[in-house]
């Protein structure tokens, strides 16, 4: 392992390794919102996110989804394939909530007849604006074929995740994915999947995700621990 920091993020730091095609991702005990405008250190959060994301990515790998995940190496570290991240947040919504409800003036909790896929341009200076396919092409981010792939793969991943979470009594409301190009130029799933980048509601409508922090609904690590234990039992 090497200790050369190559990326410092809000929730994760990334380091190089002896293998130029492999990175070490370290999950941090930090919760943020509004693109980092509010920050708070929460002991144990990094380890919980790392373990949850590792479990999800292991299941996705076994289900045939090509991801950057290699292995978990400690409670708050994992090894990943190095990718060239596509500057898009791909958001899929199964149920109205959050910014979607605010943007369109609809109540939270409405089940969408067909899940909606949205793109957001990853640019902190611009506050990650909501963009459409034409904007994506104008910005030269990806082409038509790659846009179609991102949407299709996100929908396929959604069906897998919805099924798994349903088995443990959780409703997958929405989530954000990030993809990147691997060393062969293939688009693969990257980043993480944890309650930091998805919404999960239990059967009583209780939030089991980062909204607990955003809305001051309780102890975040207690909620994440419940999600982890449910996934371990799956």
UniProtKB/Swiss-Prot annotation:
GO terms for molecular function: ATP binding; phosphoribosylaminoimidazolesuccinocarboxamide synthase activity. Disulfide bonds: none annotated. The keyword Cell wall biogenesis/degradation does not apply. Gene3D superfamilies: ATP-grasp fold, B domain, Phosphorylase Kinase, domain 1. The keyword ATP-binding applies. It catalyses: 5-amino-1-(5-phospho-D-ribosyl)imidazole-4-carboxylate + L-aspartate + ATP = (2S)-2-[5-amino-1-(5-phospho-beta-D-ribosyl)imidazole-4-carboxamido]succinate + ADP + phosphate + 2 H(+). Pfam families: SAICAR_synt (PF01259). It comes from the Bacteria. GO terms for biological process: 'de novo' IMP biosynthetic process; cobalamin biosynthetic process. InterPro entries: SAICAR_synt/ADE2_N, SAICAR_synt_PurC, SAICAR_synth, SAICAR_synthetase, SAICAR_synthetase_CS. Pathway: Purine metabolism; IMP biosynthesis via de novo pathway; 5-amino-1-(5-phospho-D-ribosyl)imidazole-4-carboxamide from 5-amino-1-(5-phospho-D-ribosyl)imidazole-4-carboxylate: step 1/2. Keywords: ATP-binding, Ligase, Nucleotide-binding, Purine biosynthesis. Its EC number is 6.3.2.6. It is an enzyme of class 6 (ligase). Belongs to the SAICAR synthetase family. This is Phosphoribosylaminoimidazole-succinocarboxamide synthase. It comes from Streptococcus pyogenes serotype M1.
């Amino acid at each position: 392992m090497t200790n050369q920091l190559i990326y410092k993020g809000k929730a994760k730091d990334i380091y190089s390794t002896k293998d130029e095609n492999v990175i070490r991702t370290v999950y941090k005990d930090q919760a943020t919102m509004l693109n980092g405008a509010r920050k708070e250190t929460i002991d144990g959060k990094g380890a919980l996110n790392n373990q949850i994301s590792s479990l999800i990515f292991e299941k996705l790998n076994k289900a045939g989804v090509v991801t950057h995940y290699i292995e978990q190496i400690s409670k708050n570290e994992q090894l990943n394939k190095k990718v060239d991240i596509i500057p898009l947040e791909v958001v899929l919504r199964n149920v109205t909530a959050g910014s979607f409800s605010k943007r369109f003036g609809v109540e939270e909790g409405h089940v969408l007849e067909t899940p909606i896929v949205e793109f957001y341009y990853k640019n902190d200076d611009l506050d990650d604006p909501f963009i459409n396919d034409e904007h994506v092409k104008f910005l030269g981010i990806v082409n038509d074929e790659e846009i179609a792939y991102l949407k299709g793969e996100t929908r396929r991943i959604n069906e897998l995740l919805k099924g798994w979470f349903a088995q443990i009594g959780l409703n997958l409301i929405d989530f954000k994915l990030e993809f990147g190009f691997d060393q062969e130029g293939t688009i693969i799933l990257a980043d993480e999947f944890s309650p930091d980048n998805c919404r999960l509601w239990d059967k009583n409508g209780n939030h089991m995700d980062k909204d607990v922090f955003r809305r001051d609904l309780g102890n975040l690590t207690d909620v994440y621990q419940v999600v982890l234990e449910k996934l371990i039992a799956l």
